[in-house]
Amino acid sequence: MLFLRLFIFTPFLILANCQARRTIKVGLLFVQNVSSLQVGIGYRTSAAAVLVTKNKIREDHVLDGFDFEFLWDFDECNEILGAGKTVDLLEVKKVDVIFGPTCSRPALISSALATYYNIPIFEWGLTSTRQLTDVKRFPTTLPFSVNSYSLAMAILGTLKQFQWTEFVFLYCNDGDDEKCESLKDDVQTVASAHEELSLAYTFRIQSKKLEDMRAAIVEIKKRGRIIVACVASGNGSKRTLMQAVALENANNSEYVYIMAETNSRGFVVEEVGGKWHYLWEGKFDDSDTFSTEDSRTSMANLLFLVDNMGMNNVVTPQYLNFSKNVIEMMKDEPFNCVEDCVGEEYSSVAKYAGQLADAFYAYAVAVNRLLTANPQAEIRNGTMILRNIGMTFEGVGGGDLTVDPDSARTSEIIMIGLNSSRLPETYGKLIINNQSVHFEQLYSDEVMDVWNGRQRPKAKPTCGFTGTQCPPDFVRDYLVIVIIIVMFLIFAVSAAVGAVFYAIRQKRKEIERQDELWHVEASHLKPISKKSKSEASQRSFASGPSTSTKLTVESRTETTRFIFYIYQVRNNEVVAANKHDFRPQLTDVERSELRQMRSLDHDNLNKFIGLCLNSQQLLSIWRYCSRGSLADVISRSSMQMDSFFMLSLIRDIANGLGFIHTSMLHFHGYLSSRSCLIDDRWQVKISDFGLNEVRGMDKLSTENMLWWAPEVLRGLEQRSKEADIYSFGIICSEVITRSSAFDLENRKEKPEEIIYQLKKGGFNAIRPSLLTDEALEINPALVHLIRDCWTEKPSERPPIDQVRSLLRGMNDGKKGNLMDHVFNMLETYASTLEEEVNERTKELVEEQKKSDVLLYRMLPKTVAEKLKAGISIEPETFELVTIFFSDVVQFTTLASKCTPLQVVQLLNDLYTIFDSIIEQNDVYKVETIGDGYLCVSGLPHRNGHDHIKHIARMSLAFLSSLAEFRVAHMPSERINLRIGINCGSVVAGVVGLTMPRYCLFGDAVNTASRMESNGKPGRIHVSSEANHLLTHVVGGFRTEERGEVIIKGKGVMNTYWLLGENDSVPVKSNMRKRENTPSMARSITPEI
């Protein structure tokens, strides 16, 4: 180790002696006034760790040519404070590196800011989010803390070590809504990535109350024996959970409970001032009736997976010395914490101070490496520093610490359990490096050490979780009775035994037969074949447009939730398969529910066909309804619905929901307009009912939650009949307004914002709008009913029987069914179709005229007519035409003061004036490129020598129009032009197939461009050829010789200024008028 240090640091020592000492500014973010965090990351017991490490850096001769200046502040684990304090460190104090924040949410914001400034930032403490290890997102961030993904990998390693292939996850967010949610997501991610591992069930405990935890244990016992649990730290939550385990008799040798945490020492609970007690000692409140020994016994099957800052659960002499120095050096410069750091609560070092020390030392070594390789390197370059961070060194705890720039610190998780003496003992160490985990076994005999003489628990008991999967042992249960009966009536006993066995067998056969009815084989599902494109196109041209809302089977495509098949067992019936994300192990209760669902039959209930268990993913099979869902019909808006139509749909939904509420299902749970299907007879059929255990594990989008009742969104209550009534009200609002739930297409809020407001509730809680089309006659009682259905309090919502009764009273005396009503609507539509066709024909003619006008604006009329007739346009030579070029003076300067939208508006206003002037002359506008304007006269319509006259008048009119032109958003600014004119021969023709343009080619075009670029603001620069036509051929115009000018690509040319037309106001007078206007115009239009 000494040789390695000399090898690394000797070159830099030589360099340091030759240069002046430099100072590295170190920024620190701490928690100061949050009492619950003092033990782990408190400022008064952790800040001096950098001073201890600074001494070690000096001893190892790292960065000998540098001094350190420590600048600190307090973010208090608040993301808003964290953002502000980080900006202050970066912008005001100009730090070279940041250590902190120590909590996940502010750490994400600070890391993003550090990435922007390319400043290295080292996270430590309670930063457990996995997002900080994303190198692409945070290339300058290196977390030294253990994140929830590492804990999930540790759980994976433990399960593999003991060959457990199936487990359940139990968690409670009460007291900490971030910790367990993060762990749950990462456990699901790890489980999904390993096929040999099955996360059978995930259950959230409603609160940390004992009764809620007992209810959770009752549910979990039906699902698994290996339970990974997560509850909030402190407040006695772990003790309460294990009490619930004992009360529900779930603490025998069949069960194992695993708790994975970072801010923990397992069974040891730390207190302020270095004190501690065991987890089973002490009571949190008066409701805790368990004795210390009972609580200790309840934890016999509990395993902890915890990070102990590299100390392997043993406090080493090195760490004791480090702890002592941190507390003592808080009184030294620069912290000078004398009076504020006195007290028993500040006598013991913070648990995570070692991470801060290790991170500071790793940073110093990385900078030393960077400067050794390149003495001129920038020490603020976070990306380059982290590229040099890969290393292994001795941490403050005495063990080796490995740092990987791609995956931060290599995590070491220890597994702690209770030995035969009911005292904590370390049974293993798990080394987590990115995607790999290694279990280092620290026990010699698994049975005796880990399980205290018992066999290792199985992931699934032999007789199943409910004990019902083992056949009854008739001999064992009835042996005495059999012997007695055999002694007296051997024949009767034989007959009785035979009858019992026969009855059991027949019952099982009946259950198996009924199970076969709902079990759908994947081989019996045939994908629906698609028609060829040519066939579909021929059908489309043959049939023309249609207003039908009925969807053909071929038009149905696979979605994220549904796929459509032909079920060959039921006469090739078309079915819809609902895809589910998880494949749980079905219990006997769930199988019984499936058998009953298979037998449900109602006019307004979609038929449940069964489950497909042997496909790639779990599928629930339902009867196909040709018109799709109610949401589809509303979104297509192709069928006009009157009030009778709407009321019929609503009544169908109410009837179907009433049947569900009185059936064995009791409630739907996920009712929405997407689960209300419509068949070809326009009858609503409710689908997607039942299977609540399966649906509860599906990943649903935020939009799917818009129909959920507020109490369900908040997690305060389970799904219920009252929640169905709320969903029914949302669906009714969609029907009468003919829009989606909450009219998302026309709202500024996103679904996430609406869900947040629904959870928030309040007196004026957010609900969909009930504004309907004025042409519809909606019964006011229906609107009142909808409002009653979605009221905030579940107890105030009307039951479904009352809803159905009210709907029957809204029929307004109308009789007949919905199909008759639809046929009457279609008959009325057919009678008006001919009139509508004639009206559409007139509209087509008008649109054709508009298209012609648009075409004539893009191309000359003669050219456009030829193209419409299919005649190719050959290039044509024009012997003499006049070309006009102009651009806006200092347009770049003006555009820099405007937004892009304002620049477009400015040019649009200016060119609108110019286009109106062009229409008064025989001039063709070729194109505009930015502020450049190109026009020509004399083509495609030849006009003799009048082309020079038209261009000259247009140019004078352009300059005259600028006197009154104002920039809309900058009224004080003035616009000026530079204009060039030339006469000569050109070739014109249509170029290109995509967006064809009528373009000009020839040297005369280039000369006109040179006249414009070599002109002056507010002047019309003309060539000698154009001047000759103006003064000697056409006449009537006044020009002034400019003299010889060097023209790029042309050499020396004699050019002229066009002053004006005889008997008209000269151009110079307009210039003087503009120059005398007070404004910033002079900055845009320089004086001539």
Curated annotation (Swiss-Prot):
Checking InterPro entries in the record gives: A/G_cyclase, A/G_cyclase_CS, ANF_lig-bd_rcpt, Cyclic_nucleotide_synthase, Kinase-like_dom_sf, Nucleotide_cyclase, Peripla_BP_I, Prot_kinase_dom
Its placement in the membrane is given as:
Single-pass type I membrane protein
* SUPFAM superfamilies on file: Nucleotide cyclase, Periplasmic binding protein-like I, Protein kinase-like (PK-like)
- PROSITE patterns under this entry? GUANYLATE_CYCLASE_1, GUANYLATE_CYCLASE_2, PROTEIN_KINASE_DOM
Q: Does the keyword Metal-binding apply?
A: no
Which tissues and organs express this gene's product? Expressed in PHA sensory neurons.
Intervals, Cytoplasmic compartment = 502-1088
Q: Where is the Protein kinase domain?
A: 535-824
UniProt cross-references to Pfam families, sorted A to Z: ANF_receptor, Guanylate_cyc, PK_Tyr_Ser-Thr
A Gene Ontology molecular function term for this protein is:
GTP binding
Spans through the membrane:
481-501
Entry keywords, A to Z: Cell membrane, cGMP biosynthesis, Coiled coil, Glycoprotein, GTP-binding, Lyase, Membrane, Nucleotide-binding, Receptor, Signal, Transmembrane, Transmembrane helix
Where is the Guanylate cyclase domain positioned along the sequence?
Answer: 882-1012
- EC numbers for this chain: 4.6.1.2
Q: Which processes are annotated in GO (biological process)?
A: cGMP biosynthetic process; intracellular signal transduction; receptor guanylyl cyclase signaling pathway
**Keyword Oxidoreductase part of the UniProt annotation:** no
Q: Which residues form a coiled coil?
A: 826-854
Q: Which SMART domains match?
A: CYCc (SM00044)
Residues annotated as region Disordered?
529-552, 1069-1088
Q: Where is the composition biased (Polar residues)?
A: 535-552
Catalytic activity annotated for this protein?
A: GTP = 3',5'-cyclic GMP + diphosphate
Quote the function comment for this protein: Guanylate cyclase involved in the production of the second messenger cGMP.
UniProt comment concerning the protein's domains: The protein kinase domain is predicted to be catalytically inactive.
Which PANTHER family does this UniProt record tie to the protein? GUANYLYL CYCLASE, RECEPTOR-TYPE GUANYLATE CYCLASE GCY-17
- Protein name listed in UniProt: Receptor-type guanylate cyclase gcy-17
